[in-house]
Amino acid sequence: MSGTLSQGSSPARLTLWEEENFQGRRCELMSDCSSIRELSGFRRVRSVKVESGAWVGFEYPDFQGQQFILEKGDYPRSTAWSGSSGYRTDQLLSFRPLLCANHSDSRVTLYEGENFQGCKFELSDDYPSLPAMGWASKDVGSLKVTSGAWVGYQYPGFRGYQYVLEQDRHSGEFRKYSEFGTQAHTNQLQSIRRVQH
C-alpha cells in the first residue's frame, strides 16, 4: 500500500541509490520498506532524493536504530541527512513515509515527567533552543503530538539524535522517552521543529 499523505496531496515517493552522488543502482519507494536489502538487493543506501512527501530513514532494517528525517530534496551523501547531528551513519537500510502531512496547525505538548506529569509546555512553532524559550530542563519525560509531525533533537540548534514524533504513531502519545525511537537512550530533548513538506 502506498503511503497516503492527506486529501489532495500526491503520494509519497522516494528514490534511493546504492552509492553517493546518485550513482550505482537505484530503487523507488512509495510505501514502507523494512529492508532495502531484501527489496532491491542493495547492500546499503548512500544517496537519496525525496520526490514528494516526507520520509524517515533508519540506520538498520525493520525501522531500527537512529532515525533521520528526509524532507523534499536531494541528499547526495550521508552528511546531507545527518547534518550537524553529531551522530553519523553512512547508510540507511529501512524507510517509511510520514502520513500526517498537514502541518498548517502543528501542535505538541511537552511534559517534564513520564505519563504526562509535571510541568508542561505547549508548542506550535519551531524552537531551536527549548531552554532559551523557557523550558527549565534539558529533559522531556513524555509528550503529546496533537497534530502534524515534529522532529525533536537531543541538543539545541537541531543537533544530536533525531526523534521523529507523529500524531499518527502511538496515537500521538509518547508516555516515556523510550517511545521517541528505538535509539532513545536519554530523555534529553532540547530543540524541536515541525516537519516540512
UniProtKB/Swiss-Prot annotation:
One Pfam match: Crystall
Span list, region N-terminal arm: 1-11
GO molecular function, a single term: structural constituent of eye lens
TM stretches of this protein: none
Organism whose genome encodes this protein: Macropus fuliginosus (Western gray kangaroo)
Gene: CRYBA2
Subunit structure: Homo/heterodimer, or complexes of higher-order. The structure of beta-crystallin oligomers seems to be stabilized through interactions between the N-terminal arms.
Protein name: Beta-crystallin A2
PANTHER family hit by this protein: BETA-CRYSTALLIN A2 (PTHR11818:SF7), BETA/GAMMA CRYSTALLIN (PTHR11818)
